[in-house]
Amino acid sequence: MALFDDVKEVVVEQLNVSPDEVKEDSKFVEDLGADSLDVVELVMALEEKFDIEIPDDQAEAIATVGDAIKFIENV
């Protein structure tokens, strides 16, 4: 659950949403109100936080908090 909390922290900070709004199945655009620039900045923040690189083609597939967690777990 610690990974979820770390991802949630980044999402809350980047998208300026309440922690209560962020669930594993929350969609960045539809549920959390992100636009395309927000998503790019979110991916960059995740890369920095977890010291990983998310290729553009794979970043496009990350639409939910759970998608981000799965990607990070498999790096």
UniProtKB/Swiss-Prot annotation:
InterPro entries: ACP, ACP-like_sf, PP-bd_ACP, Ppantetheine_attach_site. It holds the Pfam family PP-binding. Keywords: Cytoplasm, Fatty acid biosynthesis, Fatty acid metabolism, Lipid biosynthesis, Lipid metabolism, Phosphopantetheine, Phosphoprotein. Residues 1-75 form the Carrier domain. Transmembrane segments: none annotated. One of its GO terms (molecular function) is acyl binding. The keyword Lipid metabolism applies. It is found in: Cytoplasm. The keyword Iron does not apply. Carrier of the growing fatty acid chain in fatty acid biosynthesis. NCBIfam families: acyl_carrier (TIGR00517), PRK00982.1-2 (NF002148), PRK00982.1-4 (NF002150), PRK00982.1-5 (NF002151). This is Acyl carrier protein. It comes from Sulfurovum sp. (strain NBC37-1). The lineage of its organism: Bacteria, Pseudomonadati, Campylobacterota, Epsilonproteobacteria, Campylobacterales.
